[in-house]
A protein has these predicted regions:
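Short, conserved beta-strand element in jelly-roll/cupin
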Residues: 87-107, 124
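Surface loops and adjacent helix of pleckstrin homology
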Residues: 106-108, 128, 136, 146
């Protein structure tokens, strides 16, 4: 995982969009926005996932393959939905199994921070954070999705500042 400020250029979102010079964003800075990160080791990948699930009460899991083959005729529509700035009522928890991609999150100053993920990364985006997702130029990512009960990942596109989970998110972040 590597995180940095987005350059805000209006070119293909699958490009890195790293500023020049780059402005790195640390794991601690991500945490200040409520984003959690773990690096999972190959040797005991499943054990580490199981421990995080037990600690954080994630009871269920499934897998998604974000690629033309994996999503079939839904691919173009899904990719568009993922990259529209949105939030969810629930956490978005993804353990990357194969491939690469970018999660962009809005930090406390409402700047886009780009998080490059690869196999072995586990990321938790808190409920209520504005974010988006895109593949990179490899056009392939397979992820495990973790969730507590039935997940509520309906994307609510910005602006939705009046939703209770957005307000709850801002309250937690401001107290940090
Ligand atoms: C890497 S999983 C696909 C992206 C997704 O599920 C989502 O909600 C993006 O915001
Ligand atoms: Fe999302």
């Amino acid at each position: 995982m590597r995180a940095y400020l987005y350059d805000n250029l209006d070119t293909d979102c699958r490009e890195p969009h790293e500023q020049n010079p780059s402005v790195p964003v640390s794991v601690e800075e991500l945490e200040a926005s409520g984003v959690l990160y773990w690096r999972l080791k190959d040797e005991n990948f499943e054990d580490q996932i199981d421990k995080i699930c037990a600690d954080r009460n994630y009871k269920n899991r499934d897998q998604i393959t974000v690629s033309k083959q994996g999503l079939g005729e839904l691919f173009d529509a899904k990719i568009k939905t993922f990259f529209a700035e949105h939030l969810h009522e629930d956490e978005e928890i993804r353990a990357i199994l194969e491939g690469t991609g970018y999660f962009d999150i809005r930090d406390k100053q409402d700047r886009w921070v780009r998080i490059k993920v690869e196999a072995g990364d586990l990321i938790v985006l808190p409920a209520g954070i504005y974010h988006r997702f895109t593949l990179d130029s490899n056009n392939y990512l397979k992820a495990m999705r973790l969730f507590k009960e039935d997940p509520v990942w309906t994307p609510l596109n910005r602006p939705c500042d009046e939703y209770p989970y957005r307000k709850a998110y801002l309250n937690v972040i401001e107290a940090n």
